[in-house]
Amino acid sequence: MAKKKFSKDWIHQHINDPYVKMAQQKGYRARAAFKLIEILDTEKLMRRGDIVVDLGSAPGSWSQVARERLAGPGGVVDGRIIALDLLPMEPVAGVEFIQGDFRDEAVLQQLQEMVGGQPVSLVISDMAPNLSGVGVADSARIQHVCELALDFACNHLKPDGALIVKAFHGSGFSQIVQSFKQRFKRVVERKPKASRDKSSETFLVARDLKS
């Protein structure tokens, strides 16, 4: 009974969520688009000519935002957007997509080959592992995913590039922040208005690689 009530509460909240309605009106595939938009506007990130890598891209709302930001005359992407997810993603015009597990060495190699040695301007990651409900195990999974995104960014970003990663407050969060601060000159936490109040998610924005 409790599970059914939770389900009904979630559906009611979802239907009445203003960001869900705005996403539908603007053609975004998920309300998460507004989280990225707020972060980009606040941090003044992403512009035409950038090379952007979108990790954990499905269903595609962040790639849609990136496409809007990089669109030049005639709507053609000025720059590159490379997206990756374990799940399938409906095509987004101008976005190069790889379906595969970012933790898989062969998939990572495919992504690196697609980047082709070009200096990346921005890595955005909305990746989140499947959670078990066991605190210690979940914290380790979250930390691992964040560290993978961090390692990729440090190996491919240009010196003044940036990384946006979803993380969750809880055990292991301070270690994640510390790892980011060891590699970047500036690291800030952002909780966009579109993040639900009850959610422990926060976004780390790291800028300017340390030499």
UniProtKB/Swiss-Prot annotation:
Q: Indicate the transmembrane segments per the record.
A: none
Q: Taking the first listed entry, what is the main subcellular location of this protein, grouped into a coarse class?
A: cytoplasm
| Annotated catalytic residues | K166
State where S-adenosyl-L-methionine binds: G60, W62, D85, D101, D126
**In its keyword annotation, does this UniProt entry include rRNA processing?**
yes
Catalytic activity, EC? 2.1.1.166
Enzymatic reactions: uridine(2552) in 23S rRNA + S-adenosyl-L-methionine = 2'-O-methyluridine(2552) in 23S rRNA + S-adenosyl-L-homocysteine + H(+)
Question: Is Disulfide bond tagged as a keyword?
Answer: no
Q: Which GO terms describe its molecular function?
A: rRNA (uridine-2'-O-)-methyltransferase activity
Q: Where in the cell is it found?
A: Cytoplasm
Per the record, the coiled-coil ranges are: none
**Alphabetical keyword list:** Cytoplasm, Methyltransferase, rRNA processing, S-adenosyl-L-methionine, Transferase
Q: Can you supply one Gene Ontology CC term for this chain's record?
A: cytoplasm
* First-tier enzyme category under EC: transferase
Q: What does this protein do?
A: Specifically methylates the uridine in position 2552 of 23S rRNA at the 2'-O position of the ribose in the fully assembled 50S ribosomal subunit.
Record-stated family: Belongs to the class I-like SAM-binding methyltransferase superfamily. RNA methyltransferase RlmE family.
Task: Name it.
Answer: Ribosomal RNA large subunit methyltransferase E
Species source reads Bordetella petrii (strain ATCC BAA-461 / DSM 12804 / CCUG 43448)
**Gene encoding it?**
rlmE
